[in-house]
C-alpha cells in the first residue's frame, strides 16, 4: 500500500522526490511542485517548455520531415502545432492524475540525487477514439481528419502529428481540463519508471528533461536506461 510505504520513508530527500510523483499520479492539485522543479511559473509555460525544450528537439533529431512551425488548415480553421501540441500533452497529463496511486518498488539516494523505481498506470490512447465516437453529429469532421492523416502520415511527420493532436483534442472538445481513461478497468500499473530527481539540502527538487519526459510517460526510454543500473 502506497501510503503505508511512504510513512516508512524517513529520508526528507526521498519524501521531496515522491511529492513530484504524487503530483502527477495521485493529486494534481499539487502540480505546482512539478512546475517549480522545472522552473516554470504556470502550466501554460510548463507545457510550452515541455514541447519546445524536451519533446520537439527529440523529434527534430528523429524525423527529417519534422518542423515545429507546421500549421494544419482544415475546414476554414488553422491549427498551429506549437499551440496544439502543448495542449495535447496537458490533457494527456490530466489523465495520469486519474490513477490515484502508483506502486513504489524501490528507491536509492546518492548525495543530492534520488532514484525511484515505481510502476504506474498509463493512458489508453484508444479512449480518444471512443470519445470521438460520442460526437455523433460530427462524425464527418473526425472521418475527414482520419483521411487527411492517412494521406500524409508516411511523408510528413509533423503534419501527421498535428492532425492526430487535432483529432484527439476535438474528441475532448478542445478543453484543456479534459482527459481520457487509463488502461484497464481498475488500477493497472503497466509502466515501469526509473526516475532521477535532484533534491538539495533545503528540500528543493529539480527534474531534468529526460526525467520529466519519463515522469509524464512521453519518452520513457532515455531516463529508464540511464537510471535502471542503480537498482541492479
For each predicted feature, which ranges?
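Short beta-strand edge/turn micro-motifs at domain boundaries
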Residues: 1-2, 138-161, 176-232
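Core segments of small alpha/beta cavity-forming domains
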Residues: 1-95
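Short glycine-rich, low-complexity/disordered patches
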Residues: 33-41, 45, 50, 66, ...
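Solvent-exposed, non-transmembrane amphipathic alpha-helical segments
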Residues: 37-41, 136, 225
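Ordered hydrophobic segments in well-structured contexts
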Residues: 23, 115-119, 194-196
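Surface-exposed, charged secondary-structure patches
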Residues: 67-173
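Solvent-exposed, well-ordered amphipathic alpha-helical segments
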Residues: 57-62, 110-114, 199-203
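Broad hydrophobic/π-residue packing in well-ordered secondary structure
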Residues: 20, 101, 204-207
Amino acid at each position: 500500500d502506497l501510503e503505508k510505504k511512504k510513512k516508512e520513508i524517513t529520508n526528507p530527500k526521498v519524501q521531496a522526490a515522491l511529492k513530484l510523483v504524487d503530483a502527477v499520479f495521485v493529486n494534481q492539485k499539487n502540480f505546482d511542485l512539478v512546475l517549480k522543479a522545472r522552473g516554470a511559473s504556470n502550466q501554460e509555460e510548463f507545457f510550452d517548455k515541455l514541447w519546445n525544450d524536451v519533446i520537439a528537439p527529440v523529434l527534430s533529431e528523429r524525423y527529417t520531415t519534422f518542423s515545429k512551425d507546421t500549421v494544419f488548415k482544415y475546414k476554414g480553421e488553422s491549427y498551429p502545432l506549437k499551440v496544439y501540441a502543448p495542449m495535447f500533452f496537458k490533457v494527456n497529463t490530466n489523465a495520469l492524475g486519474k490513477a490515484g496511486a502508483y506502486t513504489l518498488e524501490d528507491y536509492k539516494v546518492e548525495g543530492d540525487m534520488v532514484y525511484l523505481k515505481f510502476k504506474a498506470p498509463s493512458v489508453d490512447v484508444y479512449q480518444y477514439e471512443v470519445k470521438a465516437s460520442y460526437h455523433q453529429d460530427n462524425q464527418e469532421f473526425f472521418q475527414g481528419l482520419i483521411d487527411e492523416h492517412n494521406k500524409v502520415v508516411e511523408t510528413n511527420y509533423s503534419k501527421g502529428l498535428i492532425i492526430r493532436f487535432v483529432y484527439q483534442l476535438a474528441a475532448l472538445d478542445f478543453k484543456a481540463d479534459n482527459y481520457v481513461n487509463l488502461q484497464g478497468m481498475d488500477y493497472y500499473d503497466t509502466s515501469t519508471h526509473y526516475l532521477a530527481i535532484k533534491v538539495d539540502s533545503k528540500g528543493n527538487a529539480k527534474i531534468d528533461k529526460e526525467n520529466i519526459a519519463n515522469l509524464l510517460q512521453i519518452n520513457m526510454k532515455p531516463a529508464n536506461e540511464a537510471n535502471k543500473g542503480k537498482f541492479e
